[in-house]
């Protein structure tokens, strides 16, 4: 009969054998703490909870209109070299679905269609755009919406930034106007 040589157990080995079940349970439970935030974002991205966290309302742009909403009701996020960005969602009116070619969003009045701002992407029922927020933006700035029709017509409207995103205005006031 052969004798089996066993190595003496170490403190770490004894600890692992005693607590491995509990540690594995923790590995399962810890991700559950993040589930409410995950389900909130899934409902937001899927559209179950509306266009965004904060609905701005209906904005009339020439003969057309759109519903505008902040995706997240929070200050702009730093997106690396692009700077601070703020995300908005929009939905075109039922009457203008076939008439609107493109919709743009920008802080400050656009000089021309070439500088119209960030283009909305997605279906006309739920479009999204991320607008760069310059640090030097003044508190009385306006958010300009430019809509281009298939017939070549272009219409613009503006709403105060304070109405479109109070969180961004608070963030700008905290930053202070820089020269």
Give the predicted meaning of each segment.
Residues 54-58, 161-179:
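Extracytoplasmic/periplasmic copper-protein system
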Residues 1-15:
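N-terminal Lys/Arg-rich, disordered targeting/topogenic segments
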Residues 86-89, 101, 114, 120-125, ...:
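Non-transmembrane interaction and regulatory regions of membrane-associated proteins
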Residues 120-144, 150:
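Short, solvent-exposed, Trp/other aromatic-anchored flexible loops in extracytoplasmic proteins
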Residues 67-113:
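Extracytoplasmic/periplasmic/luminal assembly and interaction segments
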Residues 14-39:
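Hydrophobic membrane-insertion alpha-helices, especially the h-region
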Residues 41-85, 116-120:
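Transition segment at domain starts
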Residues 149-156:
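Short acidic/polar inter-strand loop motif in beta-rich domains
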């Amino acid at each position: 009969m052969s004798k089996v040589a066993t190595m003496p157990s170490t403190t770490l080995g004894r600890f692992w054998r005693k607590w491995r079940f509990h540690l594995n349970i923790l590995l399962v439970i810890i991700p559950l703490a993040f589930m409410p935030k995950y389900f909130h974002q899934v409902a937001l991205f899927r559209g179950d909870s509306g266009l965004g966290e904060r609905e701005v309302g209906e904005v009339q742009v020439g003969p057309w209109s759109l519903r505008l909403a902040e995706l997240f009701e929070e200050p702009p996020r730093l997106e690396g070299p692009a700077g601070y960005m703020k995300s908005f969602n929009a939905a075109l009116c039922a009457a203008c679905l076939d008439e609107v070619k493109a919709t743009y969003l920008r802080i400050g009045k656009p000089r021309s269609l070439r500088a119209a701002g960030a283009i909305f992407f997605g279906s006309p029922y739920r479009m999204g755009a991320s607008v760069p927020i310059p640090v030097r933006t003044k508190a009385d700035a306006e958010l300009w919406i430019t809509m281009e029709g298939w017939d070549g017509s272009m219409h613009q409207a503006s709403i105060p930034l304070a109405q479109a995103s109070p969180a961004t205005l608070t963030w700008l006031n905290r930053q202070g106007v820089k020269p």
